[in-house]
């Protein structure tokens, strides 16, 4: 953020709280809809989830598993929306599915906010650094359609209102689906 956009990176929760407060008081000059649009924020840790609870209509956690969904719902309570992201790979061969997942995971495994969250979820530094099978199995859903459906159901049973799936291409090309 600082290097590319020349923005000052501050404490995430304080920065987001200030942004939400400024957004709430900004003039709105377009034609109003009958209902105001919902505001959800990307939230992983307990403090950001608490901010989502108190200042928005919900949270959108990214790159997590059902155990995180349970924790997020416990913090949010019953009212706010919980719309989680789940990466899915339609591949039944465990070794192949995990190998397809690893290049995607490598994009994120050095970012402190994700690392901290995965540690909170019970993964180890070794799991994260080496993109272990345990890490992949916790953060990706892979298998046949029934296995993917089961993982989505695990999120729903853990308290998700909606599961946003992110298909990972089985041909290894990001952004291009082959199924």
Placement of each model-derived feature along the sequence:
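Active-site-adjacent structural elements that line small-molecule/cofactor binding pockets in enzymes
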Residues: 1-179
């Amino acid at each position: 953020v600082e290097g590319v956009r020349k923005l000052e990176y501050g404490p995430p929760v304080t920065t987001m709280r200030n942004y939400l407060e400024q957004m709430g008081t900004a003039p709105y000059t377009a034609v109003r809809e009958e209902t105001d649009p919902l505001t959800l924020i990307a939230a992983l840790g307990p403090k950001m989830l608490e901010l989502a609870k108190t200042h928005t209509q919900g949270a959108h956690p990214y790159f997590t598993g059902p155990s995180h969904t349970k924790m997020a719902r416990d913090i949010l309570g019953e009212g706010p929306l919980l719309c989680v992201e789940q990466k899915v790979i339609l591949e039944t061969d465990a070794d192949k599915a995990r190998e397809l997942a690893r290049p995607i995971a490598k994009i994120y495994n050095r970012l402190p906010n994700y690392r901290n969250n995965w540690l909170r979820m019970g993964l180890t530094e070794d799991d994260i650094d080496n993109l272990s099978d345990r890490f992949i199995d916790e953060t990706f859903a892979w298998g046949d359609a029934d296995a993917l459906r089961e993982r989505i159901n695990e999120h729903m049973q853990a308290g998700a209102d909606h599961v946003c799936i992110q298909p990972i291409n089985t041909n290894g090309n990001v952004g291009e689906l082959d199924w």
